[in-house]
């Protein structure tokens, strides 16, 4: 490979490198997390791209084994990654993430490049959780931290201080207005009797509406320094909801999507679960909500006392105003990634469209595909998810799959149709070990530009049944040559010519997956320093 690369470096680049690819090319996977501990459990990456420099990427993730949240930064389009510093929290809230079926953290850039990062901290002594937000103007070298209001704990009111799975939006019209949504009453089945006041399950039973899990949002109008009281985004919804996901409409309205967890009245089958669309026109003060999809029953479990719909992944085309949402269907048949669109600001919705063009080899009744959705500036709709279609280890009668892949599909006609699915990971993910066995799993990370889609996922390739290690991996799905993806239209410190030539050389050498990880960027990456831990000054109200 080196010889071919060296030979090609002296040749002029041809006009072929100026083309726009019809079919995308997938680059080799890059390991993001670099700690060498024998037992590590990095999981549920969230991904964002800088608004002015598509080579600058950030990933938020958490180590499920050490209960640490982390942020990683790349300044060269994801070729290499460096850890940012972790924002300081009070001594009794040092942990991160707990009992999740969604993302443990979220992050987003404001238009001016300010980075906002929300995560769920956990208290080791009680397993209670709360949401923090951090703000950085230097890509994670330093942070300003604030604590969001809590829902409880107040067992008498059936709220237990278990706030998790944040979703973050920075208002495009006013970058000082920050919205953070989260899910309450998560994981309380693992809390001690001293916290719940009961030695029986208190979660989401319809019998007495006890311990309802709800989608909350809090708004800051001063860039995240202080926060308003939380608002329930599901007024009138009597069942437990699943975790909320936020996006912002073209006209500035805040939009939220979440599903439903229904449990029976202790006998018979539960009611069907719905996908909900909630919106606010007054910056998060009040919400109107309506169901936009009803999940059909699963005949494989005709006596099930639980129905679940979650993992709603929304996006908006800022040119047309189209609103999109993808989610995992867990009703009749094998699970699918479904997609709907609205062209009239959410008033009406298209029939659901199946995105995956291959099916898993078994039924299940709990989230496992975790789709994520992103919309490129040019309107291309990108969806990525975990997929079991190639599971060679599945045996008849298994209720748990073994080998998982990451797949991607795109739409260039506003979500009317999707292109053939593309596998983006370069080796199967063995799910016989790792945090997923403890239900620590969540969405694929995704972010889009016109020229590339960036995808991150958790991967066990460096682990085994003894260490059970899991890392975060990353790749690019390119719609343009490497020179354009890594160079762009302005000088960002990396030679576009070198990137393109090396990409061409290795592509020709291997005749398949394009490997670009050998390129050494001329831009130097910042080396974060670890500040002395401090207890930040935070606002810590409790809403009970």
Model-predicted regions and their roles:
Residues 17-526:
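Extracellular, repeat-based ectodomains that mediate carbohydrate processing or recognition
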């Amino acid at each position: 490979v080196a010889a071919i690369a060296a030979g090609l470096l002296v040749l002029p680049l041809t006009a072929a490198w100026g083309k726009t690819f019809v079919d995308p090319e997938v680059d080799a996977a890059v390991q993001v997390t670099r700690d060498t501990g024998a037992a590590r459990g990095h999981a549920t990456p969230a991904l964002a791209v800088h608004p002015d420099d598509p080579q600058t990427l950030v990933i938020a993730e958490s180590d499920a084994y050490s209960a640490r949240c982390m942020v990683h930064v790349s300044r060269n389009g994801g070729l290499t990654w460096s850890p940012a510093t972790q924002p300081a929290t009070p001594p009794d809230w040092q942990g991160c993430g707990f009992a999740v079926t969604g993302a443990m953290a979220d992050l987003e850039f404001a238009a001016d490049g300010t980075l906002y990062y929300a995560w769920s901290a956990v208290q080791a002594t009680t397993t209670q959780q709360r949401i923090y937000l951090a703000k950085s103007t230097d890509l994670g070298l330093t942070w300003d931290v604030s604590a969001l209001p809590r829902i409880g704990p107040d067992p008498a009111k059936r709220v237990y201080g278990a706030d998790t799975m944040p979703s973050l939006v920075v208002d495009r019209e006013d970058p000082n207005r920050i919205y953070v949504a989260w899910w309450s009453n998560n994981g309380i089945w693992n809390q001690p009797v001293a916290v719940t006041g009961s030695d029986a399950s208190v979660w989401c039973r319809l019998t007495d509406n006890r311990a309802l899990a709800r989608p909350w949002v809090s708004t800051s109008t001063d860039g995240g320094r202080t926060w308003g009281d939380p608002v329930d985004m599901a007024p009138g919804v009597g069942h437990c909801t699943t975790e909320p996901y936020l996006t912002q409409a073209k006209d500035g309205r805040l939009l939220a999507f979440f599903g439903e967890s229904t449990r029976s009245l202790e006998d018979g089958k539960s009611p069907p679960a719905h996908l909900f669309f909630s919106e606010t026109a007054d910056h998060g003060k009040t919400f109107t909500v309506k169901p936009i999809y009803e999940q059909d029953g699963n005949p494989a479990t005709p006596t099930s006392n639980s129905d679940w719909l979650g993992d709603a992944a929304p996006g908006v085309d800022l040119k047309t105003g189209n609103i999109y949402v993808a989610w995992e269907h867990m009703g009749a048949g094998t699970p699918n990634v479904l997609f709907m669109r609205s062209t009239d600001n959410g008033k009406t919705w298209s029939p659901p469209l199946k995105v995956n063009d291959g099916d898993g080899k078994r039924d299940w009744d709990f989230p496992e595909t975790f789709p994520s959705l992103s919309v490129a500036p040019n309107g291309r709709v990108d969806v990525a998810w975990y997929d079991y279609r190639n599971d060679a280890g599945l045996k008849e009668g298994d209720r748990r799959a073994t080998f998982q892949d990451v797949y991607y599909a795109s739409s260039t006609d506003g979500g009317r149709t999707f292109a053939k699915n593309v596998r983006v990971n370069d080796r199967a993910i063995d799910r016989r070990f790792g945090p997923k066995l403890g239900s620590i799993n969540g969405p694929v990370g995704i972010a889009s530009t016109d020229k590339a889609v960036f995808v991150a996922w958790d991967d066990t390739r460096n682990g085994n049944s003894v260490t059970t290690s899991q890392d975060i991996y990353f790749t690019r799905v390119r719609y343009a040559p490497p020179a354009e993806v890594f160079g762009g239209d302005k000088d960002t410190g990396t030679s576009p010519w070198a990137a393109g030539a090396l990409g061409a050389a290795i592509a020709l050498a291997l005749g398949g997956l394009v490997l670009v990880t050998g390129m050494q960027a001329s831009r130097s990456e910042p080396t974060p320093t670890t500040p002395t831990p401090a207890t930040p000054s935070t606002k810590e109200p409790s809403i009970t």
